[in-house]
Amino acid sequence: MQTMGNSGRSAHAESLTASRTIYAAREALAALFGCERADHVCFTANSTEALNIAISGLLAPGDHVLSTDLEHNSVLRPLYREKERGVSVSFLPANRQGCIDYADFDRLLQKNTRAVICTAGSNLTGNLLDLARIGAFCAAHGLLFVVDASQTAGVFPIDMCAQHISVLCFTGHKSLMGPQGTGGLCVAEGVDIRPWCVGGTGVQTFLPSQPPQYPTRLEAGTRNGHGIAGLLAAVEFIRETGMDAIRTHELALARRFYEGVRDVDGVHVYGDFSSSMRAPVVALNIRNEESSIIADALAEDYAIAVRAGAHCAPRMHKALGTVEQGAVRFSFGYYNTEEETDAAIAAVRELAEQ
C-alpha cells in the first residue's frame, strides 16, 4: 500500500481508505478471537502496551490479583507497579517442568480478588495454560480474566466468549505473522477500562476527557495504519491457510527437534512434553555452558538463529533453576522446514560433543 491517510481525521479518499482498512482489521481480529464486537478491538503498538492499558485500567488500590510464574515481564512489571499503588498479587508457583497446579487458584483466592491475569502459554517452555478451565473459575467467582495471548494468537484457537475472557491482549509480530509495531486488546462487552493514554481522537473534540466509547476510549493519537493493513493481510492469510494446518506443521517440527535432541548426552530440555498441545518452542541448555555462548556458536558456525538468556521471564527461570545460565530457545514457524529442523538437531549434537 503506497498511500494511506490518517484514519478518522478527514473525509478525503486516502483518510477513508485508512479508516476502512483499520475497521476491516478490527472485524477480522474479532472473528478470529471470538470477540463479540469489532469496535471493541483496540489497536496498540504491541502486547506490552496492551497489557499496560488493561492492567492499569482495571485495577484499583485494595484489589487482589492472581497470576502465575509463567509470566513475561509484560505482565509482571505492570503488576509490580500496581503493587506500589496498593494492589496485592499472588503467583501460582510452577514446578521444575514449568507447570502449575490448578488447585492453587482456589487456594490463593481471596475475598478482594479482582482478576486473574496470565499468559496463554510460556514463551520459555512452550507450556500452555488451560484457558477454558481458568475462565470457568473466573466466571464462577465473578473475576475479570485478562489473557496475554502473545505466544498463541494465530496458532491456537481462542474464543473469548466460550473461555470467559474479559480482555485479550495480543501482538501482531509473532504467531499472527504481522508487522512489528502492531498489537492490541479485545475487550468483552461490559468491561470498562480506564484510558491509559489520552489525547487526540478526531471525534468529540470539545470533550475535556477521552471519549467513553471503544475503540476511541483506548486509542489516543494516530494509529499505525500501514502496520495494521499488514496485520489484516496476515490474519487473512491465517484464515485462508487454516489455523489447524499452521499449528500442525509448527508442532510437528518442534516435536521432531525435541525427539532429536532430548537424549543427547549433556543436553537438558525444559518444559512439559507429555502433551502434544504446546507452543512450538523448545528451550535447552548444553551442560553448564552459558546459553549466550551456545547461541553465538549456532549463529556464527551454523547460521541458526535462536534466542538465549532470560527471555523476559524471570519467575520461570527461577522455577526451572536457570537464573544464572539462562536457556537457548528454538522457535519453529510456518515457513521452517524439516531440513532446517534436522540441521538444528545436528548442530546441537555437534556442540554437545565438543
Residue ranges and their predicted role:
Residues 1-354:
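Pyridoxal 5′-phosphate
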